[in-house]
Amino acid sequence: MGETVTLAAADGHEFGAYRARPKGKAVGGLVVLQEIFGVNDHIRGLCDSFAADGFDAIAPALFDRKQSAVDLAYDDDGIAAGRLMRRGVGWDEPILDIAAAIEAVSRSGK
């Protein structure tokens, strides 16, 4: 089972991420990207599953720039809220967050 960690992007923005590490030495690192529903049970479960297979898996919370800890349901309300959130975040800044997540797991398995 993983844990919530804090990462810092190149622009200084601090954001949450869910990180699940394997019990032994990692075979590699993976960045799991959220859907419009945030880092929810499904995304955390994917990270845990990858960790069980030997990977250091991390899912950056890409909506943290607008609202922290977004965890939406797979229903009409969740879809509507997720679409609004995605439009509000844009594309450029989340790339910085993804780069920070890549850096966090880049040495795993080496």
Report each predicted region and the residues it spans.
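N-terminal cap/leader regions of alpha/beta-hydrolase-fold enzymes
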Residues: 1-110
